[in-house]
Amino acid sequence: MVTTDGEYFVSSLMLLENFPDGDELELADEHRLVADFDMIAPDHFILAEGTGKVIEVRNGRVTQTADLKTIFTGVHRAIDGRIYAFGFNGSVYQRDGITWRALPKLRSNVLCVRASPAGIVYACGTDGLFASFDGSDWTAFDLSTNVDLQSLLVLDDGSVLLCGMSDFAGVWAAERWVQWDVPSSDYYDLALFKGRIFVGAGSEGLMVVEGSTFKVSKANVFSYSLRASARHLAIAGNNEIVRYDGKSYPCLEFNYDLEDE
């Protein structure tokens, strides 16, 4: 996992300044299984562990730990400041202030949660899961698929772009689903950067939305996780992070010899 804010680039275990040459600053115990995190500020993070803990880190120090006893797949901070942690068995937790509460369970594993500027919360996940939360309960939508929906992106007009495995992509708008004809691939993540929507297509490279389909923006990069700031798009793949500023793609590679650890 990777996120970006100005010159800060973060993997699940370390913070790097002056990318890609900066020294690594330890962010969390390397033995923790960090599923995902969201950066509130360059020195302020929310991390969701696969072990079921959600950890808040400020200036390298843990300020809050909540053990929610769920295998988490991700975490998301909404514009209104609420935090959503989500994962297996349809679990979604919401933090308002410092208090966590469990939302009603969904029918399958949750892989992505995003909130719209209007406060509507959307979730997608395994077995074709797609639903919205109105503050009290979920409304499920039938997209006529059982593929895993990996990511969603809420657009300014209120429509929702979704992508997933087995060439699945399209847009949900005005209570209607429109399937897109996209290149054959598995799709893992979506990000809005400098007015364009980018798509992580794994080993097939980085793609960009053009009309109602995807076109290759950069081949020969592994793009499983995307994070965007006003200045950069960070692309995480197999042992590498690529930074895109709209022109160039400098790359940082991690060549760890696991046998020596």
Model-derived features with residue positions:
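Residue-level hotspots at or immediately adjacent to binding/recognition sites across diverse folds
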Residues: 1-261
